[in-house]
Amino acid sequence: MEPVPLQDFVRALDPASLPRVLRVCSGVYFEGSIYEISGNECCLSTGDLIKVTQVRLQKVVCENPKTSQTMELAPNFQGYFTPLNTPQSYETLEELVSATTQSSKQLPTCFMSTHRIVTEGRVVTEDQLLMLEAVVMHLGIRSARCVLGMEGQQVILHLPLSQKGPFWTWEPSAPRTLLQVLQDPALKDLVLTCPTLPWHSLILRPQYEIQAIMHMRRTIVKIPSTLEVDVEDVTASSRHVHFIKPLLLSEVLAWEGPFPLSMEILEVPEGRPIFLSPWVGSLQKGQRLCVYGLASPPWRVLASSKGRKVPRHFLVSGGYQGKLRRRPREFPTAYDLLGAFQPGRPLRVVATKDCEGEREENPEFTSLAVGDRLEVLGPGQAHGAQGSDVDVLVCQRLSDQAGEDEEEECKEEAESPERVLLPFHFPGSFVEEMSDSRRYSLADLTAQFSLPCEVKVVAKDTSHPTDPLTSFLGLRLEEKITEPFLVVSLDSEPGMCFEIPPRWLDLTVVKAKGQPDLPEGSLPIATVEELTDTFYYRLRKLPACEIQAPPPRPPKNQGLSKQRRHSSEGGVKSSQVLGLQQHARLPKPKAKTLPEFIKDGSSTYSKIPAHRKGHRPAKPQRQDLDDDEHDYEEILEQFQKTI
């Protein structure tokens, strides 16, 4: 087949003959775009092979042959078209008459001229229909007697047979739809007429979208038929050609098999690496991989080392076989205690630094000393100094005495425990009180305890000869991440497998020839991968890793005069806890531990709770208000009356 313009090939194409393989004979390139414009291919090189799978009509451009004006018609245009001429044209009237008399057609016949004709004082415009009735002698010249219809009247014209055209014969035919006209090769580029359009004559120029397959293209290529390129049909000689289709690992992940698969890397995504493992450097173009399928289990744990100035971060597979031992957790604020609290599981902590309570805000916001033992009961609310509710963590103070001589005092404290209210912003420092020496697997640990938690690896994973987790004094297991991974090995090193997350390392690959062998026994998979700092913080931004919102800022301290004015006006509200969640029930105290308040705010006295043995005393307060205090309040009352 000789090369033809792409537009001509598509118009003459029979859809039933698809697919067809084409070779580009003359390439085209649009400057400013490498691959496509508006989703359509615009760059084809000479020699490219195209496998056309579907042709779709996009629109039809309707052109006025007289003025060259254009308009667009939708493929579902409902108008009807009639051809104004036939594919055969005649240069003179004599040729037209000769062809008509020699054929089975008889006179009269209708025709039109593509040029204006001036004769006998009249002008016949182009595309105006004339009816040739007979050939006669007129003024000694052999002429064609024609009838011209004008404004309901018929005018007889005598045109010499030597009159030059070109001329087109016209035959009445049944109106056709837009698709019927486009599917008839005999009507290609003919002048048509349509009563629903404003122009008497028009030419239809369809535009198609070609859907094709090309080498090394992941998706179907869309090519406009108006692309100025010549093509050649090579279907007969190219039936054996296999078009290579690249894949992404994320697409391989969606497959159900069969595995293993042999793949070759075509492209590695740009950007900083996510793992610090040796195999990352081997992921280059041309490297062959063996994909064994979906990794199991699908969850991972994000862990960070402790005990070093610069922490290291790891992604630990759920299949990790090392043994872990719990370590006490550290909590810098009361808000962190709330995040670790779980109903039904006692959480006991020990204060590791002295901290003064904000007794001006609430008398029950007690101070803590090093060694104070607390049991977390749950969240609640308490009255603040300004009458607003303050979010607090309700705790119970535990005894730190264990002698036999003090058993009675311990029993008394057990019957009447001291309640401690810690605002969420309380800047204390706590460490978890625990005595758990069991050795857990990673799966058991995450199932029984909430994250984050502190652990120590006491036995390495035997399937990981260079397990790095055993070298740290402690690990902080931060979050559990559920993400599908693919088990992969290098074709050059099938003995060691690793897991790739297609979501974050989506390689472009292509299926390679051959079927890899499945190794005997279980696959040796690296269950610990060290992360780069950049990727670690990227993981921490995931919805599954979102850290709880920071605690509210502490309330601003009021001035002394403002506090006293507030006290004199309405009195200090009771610091009784307003609300506790159902899971944090408080023990009923035997005696009242809160000071009583008199209606008159001017004579309010706050009593300091009795200091218990082993507890750091709270900041001393004046219990007996002197006369100056009363004088001050009297002056204030007089001042208010004066105002």
UniProtKB/Swiss-Prot annotation:
Database matches in Pfam families: CABIT
GO BP terms: cell adhesion; inflammatory response; regulation of B cell activation; T cell receptor signaling pathway
Location (main, coarse): nucleus
Top-rank taxon, per record: Eukaryota
Modification after translation (UniProt): Phosphorylation at Tyr-632 is induced by LPS. Phosphorylated by Src kinases (Lck or Fyn) following BCR engagement.
Compositional bias of kind Basic residues: 609-619
Subcellular location per the Swiss-Prot or TrEMBL entry: Nucleus; Cytoplasm
List of residues that carry Phosphotyrosine: Y632
UniProt source species: Homo sapiens
Tissue specificity field: Expressed in different endometrial adenocarcinoma cell lines and various other cell lines apart from the prostate cell line LNCaP and the ovarian cancer cell line BG1.
Function: May constitute a control point in macrophage inflammatory response, promoting LPS-induced TLR4-mediated TNF production. Determines the threshold for activation of B cells by low-affinity and low-avidity ligands via PLCG2 activation and its downstream pathways.
GO cellular component: cytoplasm; nucleus
Entry-annotated residues carrying Phosphothreonine: T593
Stated name of the protein: Protein THEMIS2
Induction record: By contact to a reconstituted basement membrane.
Keyword terms of this UniProt record: Cytoplasm, Immunity, Inflammatory response, Nucleus, Phosphoprotein
Chain segments carrying region Disordered: 546-631
